[in-house]
């Protein structure tokens, strides 16, 4: 049996402010840092050790990984960072408050932008200061690979080749792998691993800072998956994610 652990970064400053973040490089809040520390403790106490870790090129995921590995006394393991693990690019919505956007465009439209599989939000223009082509970390990317907006399908299309070429071979060779990334890049992988439909993926909410463990067979098909931690708190954290963008959230 092979094990893979997925971890969404801890709460970021824009998670706290309920903003569409996407490729904007915001940092963790103190709560987010504590979520990362707690994830590291949970993994250590459950007996996990890792051979290699993967993360995005965005600091909220990178810092989460640093904290987790520090808690586990495993900061020495190899780490690979790739833009392909970045959060989904939210286009012109990046920086906007989700609740205010729901008031302006309607709760249903915001839900479609956030959770649908193949509908993109309004795009940035290349002269927008938020355009990632202006960021030096992407200077070696072909222009056609730099998004102006993305739907989840686009995120799947950029993530899965990296999974197949870089990550999956490590898992198949019995390496213990940790992926610290983002809500939508991890939704893309979960959709693939669990063979979820487009309708099912709309209902999937991945909370910040809680390890999701996959036990896989030799063909990397899931045997089971589960979150580490207190189940009541996990369900509450999932509901917080689900309520983002609702005009009258049921808190």
UniProtKB/Swiss-Prot annotation:
Annotated positions binding substrate: 8-15, 21-22, 60, 87-90, 98, 114-115, 183-184
EC number per UniProt: 5.4.2.11
GO biological process, one term: gluconeogenesis
One MF term in the entry's GO annotations: phosphoglycerate mutase activity
Active-site positions on this chain: 9 (tele-phosphohistidine intermediate), 87 (proton donor/acceptor)
Entries under SUPFAM superfamilies matching the protein: Phosphoglycerate mutase-like
Alphabetized UniProt keyword annotations: Gluconeogenesis, Glycolysis, Isomerase
Enzyme class: isomerase
Catalytic reactions of this protein: (2R)-2-phosphoglycerate = (2R)-3-phosphoglycerate
Annotated site residue numbers, Transition state stabilizer: 182
Pathway membership, UniProt: Carbohydrate degradation; glycolysis; pyruvate from D-glyceraldehyde 3-phosphate: step 3/5
Primary role: Catalyzes the interconversion of 2-phosphoglycerate and 3-phosphoglycerate.
PANTHER family for this protein: PHOSPHOGLYCERATE MUTASE
Family that this chain belongs to: Belongs to the phosphoglycerate mutase family. BPG-dependent PGAM subfamily.
Subunit structure: Homodimer.
Protein name in the entry: 2,3-bisphosphoglycerate-dependent phosphoglycerate mutase 2
UniProt lineage: Bacteria, Pseudomonadati, Pseudomonadota, Betaproteobacteria, Nitrosomonadales
The gene coding this protein: gpmA2
